[in-house]
Amino acid sequence: MLLLRHRFLLFFMTVLFAVKPVEAASCLGDKSSQSSYSVYLVPRISATKLYQEWAPFLERLGMENGLCFVLRIPADFTEFEEAIQTGKPDFVLLNPYHQLTVVRKPGYVPLVRDENSELSGLLVVRKDSPLKNIQQLNGTAVAFPSPNAYAATLLIKALLAQKNVHVTANYVGSHSNVYRAVALGAQQAGGGANTTLDHEPKELQSQLRILFVTPEFMPHPFSAHPRIPQKVREKVITGFLSIANDPSGRAMLKSIQLAQPIRADYARDYKKLEKLKLERFSVRGSD
């Protein structure tokens, strides 16, 4: 147990000192473009991995549509949430809860989403954990990535509350941190999402067992600030759809979890989530 704690502390010291914002050093796409547009991503997994997945796609999207993108990955959830609330991103990949919170002010408009890949929250435990059901978590502590993470925190908290299961939340900074904390035995259970667990190394996945899965909901939309001209928004939408038409493009889109992009519509795709009243479980100024 002491060895596990030591390894856990070393891991989080590494994460603490490694965390910093990631920004593309130069334009991704058409470098002759007179305008550049920022693209923000929520730091659900490591910034390095996000950059490796998104930079090639944005380079192609920009080159094919005469656009220049600057990729920005905030250091943590709090910085990301502050950015979207103040309208800093021109374009941003939002979790569905964040889309609810910014659809009116600053007014972010969902442009595209994946057609088939739906999002589920997960509660994971170690593979050898004695826990068999979520009722056994009542009165215990559970790891979550951040207060306002959509599938990994808010959906799980809402559904646990419906079942009269009350837990104390330990926020550890990211989905990746949750999985590692549980695997190392530092946390008995943790909240994540199907889309992020699938990104983890097979060796780590093999150490975990899924205890609970939420119903599926719409995945993250790629959204635009209302200041972006309609002509530019349309270029981005048609660019996504066009890239999906060839094998190399589909591989890029699959890596960013938008394998089959379609036009998104707030009223059709996300307004229904308002009925869940997830704000009861959110923490203002966090995520």
Predicted segments, located by residue:
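N-terminal hydrophobic or amphipathic helices and topogenic motifs
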Residues: L2-L4, F12, A18-E79, Q85-G87, ...
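Periplasmic-binding protein-like
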Residues: Q34-R44, N116-V125, E203-A244, K254-E279
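Sec-exported extracytoplasmic/periplasmic mature domains
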Residues: G62-G66, Q85, A161, V165, ...
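Short helices/loops that flank or line small-molecule/ion binding pockets
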Residues: T78-V92, K105-P106, Q135, S176-G191, ...
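Short loop/helix-cap segments at secondary-structure boundaries that form the rim of catalytic
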Residues: T101-K105, E200-E203
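A structural signal for short loop-to-beta-strand junctions that line the ligand-binding cleft
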Residues: P106-E115, L211
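Pocket-lining segment of extracytoplasmic ligand-binding domains
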Residues: S129, N138-K231, T238
